[in-house]
Amino acid sequence: MKKNIIILFLLLHQSFFAQSQTKIIDMHIHSYTDSDFGDREPSQDYYGKKGSKDAESHRIETFAAFEKFNIVKAMVSGNPESVENWVAKDDDHRIIRGILMFSPNDHEMDSVKFEQMVKDKKIEVFGETAPYYGGTTLSDSIWQPYLRICEKYDIPVAVHTGGGDPGGTYSWSPKARLKLGDPYLIEDVLVKYPKLRIYMMHAGGEDWPEHAIRLMAYYPQLYTDLAVMLWVEPNTQRYVKEFLQNIKEAGYLNRVMFGSDQMKWPYAIGKSVDFLNSLDFLTEQDKEDIFYNNAARFLKLKE
């Protein structure tokens, strides 16, 4: 009898803990198809942790993290096939459809196809846009037809800032150059499309966190996520800690949003949540705002 009471207490405690967790919106999640994994061994991260073995395992593990950490919405970018596969299996309606594009013609895309996908609600966020990897910037003329459509239909834009995969220029992204990750390179977009909802991904990375803050100071419509910075390496964690301290002091913390950028390592979602929660210079309200409130405002979510 005593054992049963203890078990009941533990179950009730776990249930209460799950219900009391802060709601989270993850503004930076990636989806994949099996072609992204191939037959090779799972990738290892900086810490030697192996990623998911295939696309379905990756989805299942990511969905489990959504449940565990009370992630109620997630902006998912990948190729359109992978995103739609996730949506079809998303019984809890968490997924916000994004699209991963390095170049304007990825996925055989053009402005006509793009606009139709927007109308059909197959694209709800234009991102992750990552011109950095394709050797361009979002301010270049080749991206303007898409941005005009986003402004017309009030579609948020998510743009990669900061650097990328170390050594990637020698392999899968030969056109990538570090200078292309400077947040200042999107300033012309902010000027040209003042009504556009836009957020930086990675908060300028390790390279330009101060540029990210200055840009947010000048352009009040600009937000940022913290994706990848919260988990991928000790150095990024150092930079994001300084970024959060500085942007809080500057008064723009209300435009900072949580993002994990789990890539092929779903465990990174929990690691990102835990690291943000460990920062004692942030108040509980600060954390609530970063985890949920700021993104809910940016996305114009209705309760």
For each predicted feature, which ranges?
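Mid-to-C-terminal alpha-helical segments outside catalytic/metal-binding sites
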Residues: 2-3, 19-30, 36, 45-73, ...
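Active-site gating loops and adjacent loop-to-helix segments of metal-dependent hydrolytic enzymes
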Residues: 33-57, 94, 165-169, 220-223
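Active-site gating/metal-coordination segments in enzymes
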Residues: 81-168, 175-177
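Mid-chain, structured segments of secreted extracytoplasmic proteins
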Residues: 62-94
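Catalytic pocket-lining loop regions of alpha/beta-barrel enzymes
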Residues: 124, 139-257
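Active-site environment of divalent metal-dependent phosphoester hydrolases
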Residues: 32-34, 80-84, 104, 132-134, ...
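Hydrophobic faces of well-ordered beta-strands that scaffold small-molecule active sites
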Residues: 25-29, 74-76, 95-100, 125-128, ...
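Sec-dependent N-terminal signal peptides
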Residues: 4-13
